[in-house]
Each structure stands twice: as C-alpha cells, then as structure tokens.
Swiss-Prot record:
Enzyme class label: ligase
Organism: Phytoplasma australiense
Entry keyword Magnesium: yes
Subunit structure: Tetramer of two alpha and two beta subunits.
Name of the protein described by the UniProt record: Phenylalanine--tRNA ligase alpha subunit
Cofactors named for this entry: Mg(2+)
Keywords: Aminoacyl-tRNA synthetase, ATP-binding, Cytoplasm, Ligase, Magnesium, Metal-binding, Nucleotide-binding, Protein biosynthesis
Molecular function terms from GO: ATP binding; magnesium ion binding; phenylalanine-tRNA ligase activity; tRNA binding
A GO CC annotation given for this chain: cytoplasm
Cofactor: how and how many bound: Binds 2 magnesium ions per tetramer.
Amino acid sequence: MHNKINLLKEKFEHDLAKNKNSLENLIYLEQKFLGKKSFLQELNQTLKNIPSEKKPAIGKLINEFKKTIILSLQKEKQYLKTQKMNLELMQESVDVNLPGFNFSTGSIHPLYQIIEQLEDLFLSLGYEIKDGNEIESDFYNFEMLNIGKNHPARAMQDSFYINPQKLLRTHTSNIQVKEMLANEGKPLKIISSGKVFRKDNDDATHSHQFMQLEGLVIDQKINFLNLKETILTIIKELFGDSQEINIRPSYFPFTEPSIEVDLVIRKKDNSKEYLEILGAGLVHPQVLLNANYNPEKYQGFAFGIGIERIAMIKYQIENIRHFYQNDIRFLKQFSKKVKHENS
C-alpha cells in the first residue's frame, strides 16, 4: 500500500509539471486525483481491505497525500490567475500622453453669494448671524411685530397657513423677535437671512418664495442717522461709492418712522429711474415693549433686503425665475461674472 501511494505521488508530480500552464488542465487533474472516480477514491476503497491495526497509519498517509494535491493545485491556479490579471492590467494601462477629462467645478449659488458678501460686511461691523424656523406661529410672525389679528397690514403679506396657528414665515423678522426676548432687555446687533413665503403671483419680477436678509440693532441713543449710515454702507458694498439713492417715507407696522430706499438709475437721456432696494425704519416702541425692552431707555433700527432684487439689479437679470430653474448655462455665466468682478 505504501508503494502504491508513493507511485501515485510521483504520477501527480509528473502530471502537475506537465499541465500547470493551463487552468483547464489543472481542473482536469483535480477531477483525476480528487473526483468521484479518482485515484484517491480508489485508495479509500482499498482501505477497507487493510488489517485494522494498519488502517490508522495508511489512512494518515492517504489524507496527507490528499492535502498535498489540494494545496499544490490551489497554488498553481492562483499563480495562473495572477499572471492573467497582470497581463490584462498591462494591456489596459493608461497612456499618460492622452488628454485628461475636464470635470465641472461647482460654485455657490448666485443668491448665496450675495448673502455671503453681506454677511462678511456685517460681521466686520460687529453683528452676529442668527437663524430660525421657516414654519412659524402667527404670534411670532405677526402679533409680536405689532400686526394684530385684524390689522390691515396683514393684507400686505397674504400668507401660506398650515393651520390657524402656523404658517410659512413671511419675513425673517420672526428671528429678531425671538432674539430680543432671549436677550432679556440688553443691547442687540444681529442679522438673519433665509427663505420667506408670500402668496404672490409669480411673474418675471415676483415669486411666492424669495430670499431675505434683515438686520436689527437695539441700544441706547440709537437714531435715524445710525440707520442712514448703515444703509449707505450697504449700498457702497453692493454697488460702489458712486451709486445714488433716494430715501422716501413708507409704512411698516413694526417701525416708526419707516422708509424705503431706491437706487437712482440714470438713463442715456439723463432721466432717472427709481428701483426699490430695501425697507427700513426705527423699531416701533410697541415692538420694544412686546420684547421686554424699555422704549424710554432703548431704541433700535431694522432693515430688510430682498436678495433676488439685489442680484437682478446688480447683474441686470430680467427674470427672477432664473434663480430657481437650475439651468447650468445661467449659473455658469453668472459664476464667471462674479469671479471676474472679485478678481
């Protein structure tokens, strides 16, 4: 029996050396030596006829032979697979002389570029940036801002109500009210920005959703001159030193007095066109009282800027819809324009 096993070992080594260059031949060898009708199976059958006292030793030799066959075949198969993979990699190697691919580089949306420009300005002036909810209660969106349940000014901001108590905010002033309450009657200097929603008819210059940035300053001895200087700083940042403006009286329930600011655009015939740019005013005493400020001691001013309107005027964009359609041609064109101006 020992001689038979040794002869099979020699035969396997001979056949392996002859057939190891082909994966198909290795599979054939596997069947020949390990399959159901293989040499190894014949050895297992003859084991039945071996005397009992010799079976353990012979069985051990057979198992060692089987293990040798399995490991040898696995080694040669892996070698062939590695060779094949290396050959494929060489054939598929990258030609470094070929031109590369151009990948599109993203950029910040035009509206957020305007917001970031203004945020940088106000941070340099000592303001803090605050954020708040887009879904707001009627109480914080209207009543705390001196716009009662039956106040006619509510018609100016026809709104999207979720239920009788909740609505999509019509301005970012809800953030200001909450910050005033949290500040417990101390000086305050903040800006806030984000989406606001009004039931408007969408057209080239109006949208039911738009971006707004508002500012609020509360301290002792705040007056209209402080507000005017802030407005001039904003205009200078956005449109340069030479931009002419027009300040005219207006009405907002939460400020008194209230103003609106127009850009003065001179046409070729030297006539003037007035483009509304922002609303502002001194904080109404009732709003101060609502937020636990003493109007005899503290005063404040507030302003609100429509970001889309700024961008449309600044970059001569005729249709507000361009900001929301995600047309890559428009966004790329605008991105180049901004980079050119900042360079």
